[in-house]
């Protein structure tokens, strides 16, 4: 296929057109009075959204060169969402502002490489200043405020996330699911839960809830299959003497071993239940070890020279209760020593820091949460499927932003933190490097300008007022149209969101500004299908039956 090549200003201007179109679609969603964007789908109802990254992902332009520019900034929006959970619109608006301002200077004769160097230095200084301006999230109220802003000013979602985080802790797992009703719900599972249910319905003790519930049980952990009853008999006899319930967690339990457990349960000889161990392979062994540490027991493992026959009461874990349904097992208040649990938590945290695999990291974080905080499930309700999807996206965004706030701290929101950070830096740069720094500094006004514009206010006046204010925490509340103390009004952003948005915006803008040639495919129009009307009645085929 033939290729089209553009050089210098012509190439950059084409790229800019694509960036501008993407920015124009995304920027309208910014701020408390941002507008909706309606997106056509190839099937089903159109999507209505105020989520910047959802809009950016849908922008696909006809002109291949414009599309190259748009796709680079689209990647920045997605990357910002992945790293910080929010700030996609901020990153897009900043990237556009930096590219636009830089293009003007480079067209006027500035050296792109020197300009890039100045931009990088300014970005570094502003990020350092943002970190100085940040402070820790102090309480549940501030968590709710961060979540509310990220959920497009939905206080109910903000409070729901704050409740979830309060109950499971900052390391706890919070998942978002679709509810089967129109109401939002928060369900918290205290203790460790894993996705394995009872091996036989005969183990059920609560027929109303269809669950097997064991109070103060012993917990036997074995890393192989149990099929032979002879191996299991010694420990069962010891358990019977204590009169306590028993939970067996093993790779699998089958044959006569499972049949005997069921018969003993039905006859009332033993209150017993059995489940498969969670995970697979090495991960299963690690999770069994986690359960052992949580419950104060030991994993009976043939690799360590132990057999099931040799197991004694001292090897068993304990918990205040265990609840098992057909899909999940929940161990509440394991009897493990706090020091051992904390050591295991620190070990998993170290593994998370070292791993380069996203999948492994996710699984390690799940294990960490099971040990340290428990699990909270936010169920999002809505009247229609379209509303449900849009709301679930907002809850996901708000949850990620809240975790970012807890991780790195908060700064004043509404685009004001970037302007305050800009006023505090002093870079002694010369020539085109100074121009590069000035480009970034001017672009930092863009988010606040856009928020004010979307709310229907004079953007120039708003930016000047905030910039010239002597009060460090003063910003513009676009929802009310007032200049307020942003911290006191609860208008705050995670510093990680601001930092990542700026770094990614400068990165893509400087890459676009230093582009000197572009190569793209020439889209050829496919010839139309020939007109069939002149082919007559195909009368010669009349003899076919």
Curated annotation (Swiss-Prot):
Keyword Iron listed: no
GO molecular-function terms, A-Z: ATP binding; ATP-dependent protein folding chaperone; isomerase activity; unfolded protein binding
Catalyzed chemical reaction(s): ATP + H2O + a folded polypeptide = ADP + phosphate + an unfolded polypeptide
GO cellular component assignments: cytoplasm
Keywords: ATP-binding, Chaperone, Cytoplasm, Isomerase, Nucleotide-binding
EC number from the UniProt entry: 5.6.1.7
Disulfide bonds: none
Top-level taxon in the UniProt lineage: Bacteria
Localization in the cell: Cytoplasm
RNA-binding found in the keyword field: no
Function field: Together with its co-chaperonin GroES, plays an essential role in assisting protein folding. The GroEL-GroES system forms a nano-cage that allows encapsulation of the non-native substrate proteins and provides a physical environment optimized to promote and accelerate protein folding.
Family to which this protein belongs: Belongs to the chaperonin (HSP60) family.
Subunit structure: Forms a cylinder of 14 subunits composed of two heptameric rings stacked back-to-back. Interacts with the co-chaperonin GroES.
Protein name: Chaperonin GroEL
């Amino acid at each position: 296929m033939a290729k089209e090549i553009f050089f210098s200003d012509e190439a950059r201007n084409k790229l800019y057109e694509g960036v501008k179109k993407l920015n124009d679609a995304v920027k309208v969603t910014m701020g408390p009075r941002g507008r909706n964007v309606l997106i056509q789908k190839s099937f089903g109802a159109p999507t209505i959204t105020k989520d910047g990254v959802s809009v950016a992902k849908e922008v696909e332009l006809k002109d291949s060169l414009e599309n190259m520019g748009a796709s680079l900034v689209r990647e920045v929006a997605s990357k910002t969402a992945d790293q910080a959970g929010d700030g996609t619109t901020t990153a897009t608006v900043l990237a556009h502002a930096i590219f636009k301002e830089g293009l003007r200077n480079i067209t006027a004769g500035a050296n792109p490489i020197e300009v890039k160097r100045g931009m990088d230095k300014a970005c570094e200084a502003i990020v350092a200043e943002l970190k100085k301006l940040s402070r820790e999230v102090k309480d549940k109220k501030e968590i709710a405020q961060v979540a509310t802003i990220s959920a497009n000013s939905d206080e109910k979602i903000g409070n729901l996330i704050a409740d979830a985080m309060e109950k499971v802790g900052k390391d706890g797992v919070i998942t978002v699911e679709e509810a089967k009703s129109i109401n939002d719900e928060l369900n918290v599972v205290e203790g460790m839960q894993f996705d394995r249910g009872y091996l036989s319905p005969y183990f059920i003790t609560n027929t109303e809830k269809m669950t097997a519930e064991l109070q103060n049980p012993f917990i036997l952990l074995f890393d192989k299959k149990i099929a032979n009853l002879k191996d299991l008999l010694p420990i069962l006899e010891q358990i019977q003497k204590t009169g306590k319930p028993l939970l067996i967690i093993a790779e699998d339990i089958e044959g006569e071993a499972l049949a005997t457990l069921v018969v003993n349960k039905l006859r009332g000889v033993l209150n017993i239940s059995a489940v498969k161990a969670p995970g697979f392979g090495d991960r299963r062994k690690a999770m069994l070890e986690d359960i052992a540490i949580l419950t104060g027991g030991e994993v009976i493992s043939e690799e360590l020279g132990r057999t099931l026959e040799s197991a004694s009461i001292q090897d068993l874990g304990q918990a205040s209760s265990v609840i098992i349904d057909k899909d999940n097992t929940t161990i509440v208040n394991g009897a493990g020593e706090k020091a051992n649990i904390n050591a295991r938590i620190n070990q998993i945290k170290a593994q998370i820091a070292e791993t380069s695999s996203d999948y492994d990291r996710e699984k390690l974080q799940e294990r960490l949460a099971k040990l340290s905080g428990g699990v909270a499930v936010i169920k999002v309700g809505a009247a229609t499927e379209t509303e449900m999807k849009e709301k679930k996206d907002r809850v996901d965004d708000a949850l990620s932003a809240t975790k970012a706030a807890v991780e790195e701290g908060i700064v004043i929101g509404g685009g004001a933190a970037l302007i305050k950070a800009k006023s505090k830096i002093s870079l002694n740069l010369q020539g085109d490097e100074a121009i590069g720094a000035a480009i970034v500094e001017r672009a930092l006004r863009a988010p606040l300008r856009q928020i004010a514009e979307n709310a229907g206010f004079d953007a120039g006046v708003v930016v000047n007022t905030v910039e010239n204010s002597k009060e460090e925490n003063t910003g513009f509340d676009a929802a009310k149209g007032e200049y307020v103390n942003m911290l006191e009004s609860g208008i705050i952003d995670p510093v990680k969101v601001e930092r990542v948005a700026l770094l990614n915006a400068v990165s893509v803008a400087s890459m676009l500004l230093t582009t000197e040639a572009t190569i793209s495919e020439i889209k050829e129009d496919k010839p139309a299908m020939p007109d069939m009307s002149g082919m007559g009645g195909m009368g010669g085929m009349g003899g076919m039956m």
